[in-house]
Structures are given as C-alpha cells and as structure tokens.
Amino acid sequence: HASNVTGNRNDLRRIGKICRETGTLLIVDASQTAGIFPISMKEDNIDVVCFTGHKSLMGPQGTGGLCVRKGVEIRPLLSGGSGILTFEKEHPSAMPVRLEAGTLNTHGIAGLLAGVRYLMEEERWKNFQKKELRLAELFYRELKDCPKFIFYGDPAGGLRVPVISLNLREEDSGE
C-alpha cells in the first residue's frame, strides 16, 4: 500500500477497480499504513490484506495478521500441531485454524489488540496520521533546499506516508 523507502502511497481504490475488472487477485501489504490510513477491503476490492502489528498499530514485535476475503483459497505454509486436532493426520481445513500451525503468540495477540483498541478510542488514529504527516512535511520543508541532500520518492506528493528517505550527496550510503 505504501513504500517504506520512498513514502509514496498507492491509490488502492483505483488499483482495486482495475484488478476486479480484470479478475486479478489483489493482495495488499499494509505494513506501512495499517493504523494510519483507513483500508476497506470491500470498497477497495481487496482480496487479501497483510500487516505487521509493531508499527502504527502499536502492537508488540512479532505480531501481524492476514485478512482474507471469503472465497479466496490459501494454502497453509506449515502444518501440524494445530492444538485442536493434535492426533489427526490431516491439518484442519476450516479457517483460520487452517493457517495456524503450532502455538499461537497469545501474549503478542493480546498486546496487538490493546494497541488497536487504543487507536480506535476517540479515533486517535486520525490524530496520529495528521501529526506524523505534519512532522514529515516539516522535516522535508526545512531540508529540501539544502544542496547536501538527495531525496527519494516524492516528499511533496499527494499520496504519502510519513517517511522521508534521503542521502548525503558526498557520502557513501553504506557508511
């Protein structure tokens, strides 16, 4: 949905419309946008959304999720140890347990839930979005005319996340 390098954000509604018209499955990586920008699987014609919990959703590291539109078939990456049908030779076929091999990160999931609830209270996510975009804009505005910097992406563009990538012209980026 957005680049963690350039900060550019894609127009999901437009992309989703094209995908639906062409019968193309739309899988969205919302790692940079979940918790900052609203995403509607229905309105944006998204088939699958994956996200990380430790960024703007304020969950612990090691958390994340996969939202799958009903009717989309996903094969499990791992199987075994479901905890529900431990002694069966076949992994459960029902969702979501079909994709849950091994012991769930219950503490992490509880932490992610707490982060999401916090953001949803009083629509705090809107304030975070405005504040982070404002800080990124201020940072870019103060440095954009400095000849020492090379900026990547389109920091002044419309569809953005609060990420500014730059290099010092005279320095190796590996240093």
What is the role of each PLM region?
Residues 1-175:
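Pyridoxal 5′-phosphate
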